[in-house]
Structures are given as C-alpha cells and as structure tokens.
C-alpha cells in the first residue's frame, strides 16, 4: 500500500466517522489503517540521519493512530484506546526529536490520564505525569485531569467544577461517566456496609438516579430487598463496619453531585 493510498483511506475514515457511519462501514477502513500504521509506513532504524520520507511516514502513522484512539473513545472501546495510546507513546516520546509535535498530542495524553483515574490506576497516573515536561503541565488538556486527581485526593471537589466549558473536549465526558458510575458503586457498597436500612427516596437521591426505572433496575442488579418504601440491607448488628459511613457517604455524594454537574 503506497503513501497516497493510505492518505486516501485516512480521509475516507475521517468522513465516515464525521458522518456517524455504522461500524460495518468503518471497520474495513480501520483495519487497513491499522496495517498501514504498523507495517506499511516506514520506521527509523536509528534517530540520527532520518530521511524526509521516513519522517513523512511517521507523521502519517501518528495521525492514523491518533484518530483511531479518538474513534475508540467515541464508541467507548476503552481497551482499544489503551492499546492505541501505548503505540502512540513511541511517537510522542521516542520520536519527538525527529518530528514536530502533533496538535492532538496533549489532548490524547490527557485522555489517557483520565482513563487511568477512571480505572483507579493512581500509580500509573503519576508515572505518566512524570513523562510530561514541566512547562506543559499547565496545558488545559493536562491540567484538567491533574485537578480531578487533586480533588479526589483532597476531597475538595468544588475546585474543579466551574461549568461544562471547563471540560477540555467532549471525549473527556466518557471517562467522567465511567468515574461517576464507579462512585455510584462506592456509595452503594458503603451503604450496604454501613446501614441496615435506607429509604428508597434517600437511596435514589444518594445514588444520583434521575430515572426511577433505572433506579429500580439497579436495585434488582444489586439484589437488594425492598419492603414498603425501604431497602433492607440485612446487616448483622455484630458486623464490624470499617468505613466511617456517614462521613464517607456525604463526601462521596458531594463528589458525585459535582461530577454530575460536569457530565
């Protein structure tokens, strides 16, 4: 596959994604682009005396991987995003001395930071931060996940909440949704360990459900028993509760409410 054919496939991919085409149309083009980025486009054997042709191939391969990573988030295929980002790291860090930075670089690095936060991979988050040059930590795409991480650590979540416009790009919403769902699970687990009963009204409010049907479905998924208007958790009086229930629930509820304002 020659360079012009790869460019043509990439332009076709952009049009299909922008037009919200279905996966059946996009997948064949996507497969061809993945092959192009990994096999057909040339990589340097060393970082010295790199030819213009190889540099041109690197830039195109990077763009392909960047657009695939954003598409992966769009269709909520987080595993695909992770795999593609790991490929991109070579272009962002190893090849930075031979090709100019991409305009999408910090957005995608920031999205990976959000992925790590959403998956509770704190140590990996800090390892990735160490790879970023200090003067780029104030980049809006990097600053947002840093503020989210700081707020999680401190519990002062209001610091990151200003308005929806505070989110650097629409792709960040996907990871905020994952994080919000994770918080709901934490609240539910905390409630089960801390209380013998909880009213349906309070539970729906605490878990931030705006749709009662979804709330009822969640109750079924958790196998909670409902008697009248009360959820029975069935805790034993002698059960040791290691979680400071009210404090954690109130703190987590505040955090979840603030995240809901972003989402």
Swiss-Prot record:
Pfam family, one: CSN8_PSD8_EIF3K
InterPro entries (UniProt xref): 26S_Psome_Rpn12, CSN8_PSD8_EIF3K, PCI_dom
GO cellular component, one term: proteasome regulatory particle, lid subcomplex
Keywords on record: Developmental protein, Proteasome
Domain of life: Eukaryota
Start and end residues of each PCI domain: 79-248
Coiled-coil ranges (or none): none
UniProt-listed GO biological process terms: proteasome-mediated ubiquitin-dependent protein catabolic process
Family listed: Belongs to the proteasome subunit S14 family.
Function summary: Acts as a regulatory subunit of the 26S proteasome which is involved in the ATP-dependent degradation of ubiquitinated proteins.
Name this polypeptide is given: Probable 26S proteasome non-ATPase regulatory subunit 8
Gene field: psmD8-1
């Amino acid at each position: 596959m020659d360079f012009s054919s790869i460019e043509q496939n990439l332009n076709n991919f952009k049009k299909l994604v922008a037009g919200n085409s279905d996966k059946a149309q996009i997948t064949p083009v996507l497969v061809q682009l993945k092959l192009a980025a990994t096999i057909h486009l040339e990589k340097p054997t060393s970082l010295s005396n790199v030819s213009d042709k190889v540099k041109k191939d690197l830039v195109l391969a990077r763009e392909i991987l960047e657009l695939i990573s954003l598409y992966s988030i769009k269709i909520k295929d987080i595993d695909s995003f992770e795999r593609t980002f790991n490929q991109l790291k070579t272009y962002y860090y190893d090849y930075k001395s031979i090709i100019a930075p991409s305009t999408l670089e910090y957005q995608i690095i920031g999205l990976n930071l959000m992925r790590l936060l959403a998956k509770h991979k704190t140590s990996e988050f800090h390892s990735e931060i160490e790879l970023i040059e200090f003067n780029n930590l104030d980049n809006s795409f990097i600053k947002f996940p840093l503020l989210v991480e700081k707020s999680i650590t401190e519990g002062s979540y209001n610091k990151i909440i200003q308005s929806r416009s505070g989110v650097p790009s629409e792709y960040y919403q996907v990871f905020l949704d994952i994080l919000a769902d994770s918080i709901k699970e934490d609240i539910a687990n905390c409630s089960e360990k801390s209380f013998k009963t909880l009213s349906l009204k309070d539970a729906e409010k605490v878990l931030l459900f705006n749709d009662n049907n979804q709330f009822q479905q969640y109750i079924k998924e958790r196998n909670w028993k409902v008697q009248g208007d009360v959820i029975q958790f069935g805790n034993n009086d002698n059960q040791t509760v290691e979680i400071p229930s009210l404090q954690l629930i109130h703190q987590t509820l505040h955090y979840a409410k603030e995240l809901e304002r972003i989402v």
